[in-house]
Amino acid sequence: ACGPGCSGSCRQKGDRIKCINGSCHCYP
């Protein structure tokens, strides 16, 4: 989960998770 205020799901699986412009992004 990206946390509160962050929507969407990660297209890539990774350990680093960031919330950019309210969207969830994962990085390997």
UniProtKB/Swiss-Prot annotation:
GO terms for molecular function: potassium channel inhibitor activity; toxin activity. The record marks 27 as: Aromatic residue of the functional dyad. Expressed by the venom gland. It is found in: Secreted. Residues 17-24 are annotated as: Interaction with Ca(2+)-activated K(+) channels. Keywords: Disulfide bond, Ion channel impairing toxin, Neurotoxin, Potassium channel impairing toxin, Secreted, Toxin, Voltage-gated potassium channel impairing toxin. It comes from the Eukaryota. Coiled coil: none annotated. One of its GO terms (biological process) is envenomation resulting in negative regulation of voltage-gated potassium channel activity in another organism. Signal peptide: none annotated. Disulfide bonds join 2-19, 6-24, 10-26. GO terms for cellular component: extracellular region. The record marks 18 as: Basic residue of the functional dyad. Belongs to the short scorpion toxin superfamily. Potassium channel inhibitor family. Alpha-KTx 13 subfamily. Negative results: does not block Kv1.1/KCNA1 and Kv1.3/KCNA3 potassium channels. Potent and selective inhibitor of Kv1.2/KCNA2 potassium channels. Has the structural arrangement of an alpha-helix connected to antiparallel beta-sheets by disulfide bonds (CS-alpha/beta). This is Potassium channel toxin alpha-KTx 13.2. It comes from Orthochirus scrobiculosus (Central Asian scorpion).
